From Swiss-Prot:
HAMAP family: PSII_PsbK. The lineage of its organism: Eukaryota, Glaucocystophyceae, Cyanophoraceae, Cyanophora. It holds the Pfam family PsbK. This is Photosystem II reaction center protein K. Residues 1-8 form a propeptide. The gene is psbK. It is a single-pass membrane protein. One of the components of the core complex of photosystem II (PSII). PSII is a light-driven water:plastoquinone oxidoreductase that uses light energy to abstract electrons from H(2)O, generating O(2) and a proton gradient subsequently used for ATP formation. It consists of a core antenna complex that captures photons, and an electron transfer chain that converts photonic excitation into a charge separation. SUPFAM superfamilies: Photosystem II reaction center protein K, PsbK. GO terms for biological process: photosynthesis. The keyword ATP-binding does not apply. Keywords: Cyanelle, Membrane, Photosynthesis, Photosystem II, Plastid, Reaction center, Thylakoid, Transmembrane, Transmembrane helix. PSII is composed of 1 copy each of membrane proteins PsbA, PsbB, PsbC, PsbD, PsbE, PsbF, PsbH, PsbI, PsbJ, PsbK, PsbL, PsbM, PsbT, PsbX, PsbY, PsbZ, Psb30/Ycf12, at least 3 peripheral proteins of the oxygen-evolving complex and a large number of cofactors. It forms dimeric complexes.
Length: 45
């Protein structure tokens, strides 16, 4: 009972993190872009 009550409150507790969760899938794309820019900066050696 206590566990189900805790789980029921989780969505409200995590509502604060929704913007972060929306951004998370984009982060690997930033790493790919960073790698490309880094290679361009050193001249694709």
């Amino acid at each position: 009972m206590l566990m189900s009550l805790f789980l029921a409150k989780l969505p409200a507790a995590y509502a604060l993190f929704d913007p972060i969760v929306d951004i998370l899938p984009i982060i690997p794309l930033f790493f790919l872009l960073l790698a490309f820019v880094w290679q361009a900066a050193i001249g694709f050696k």
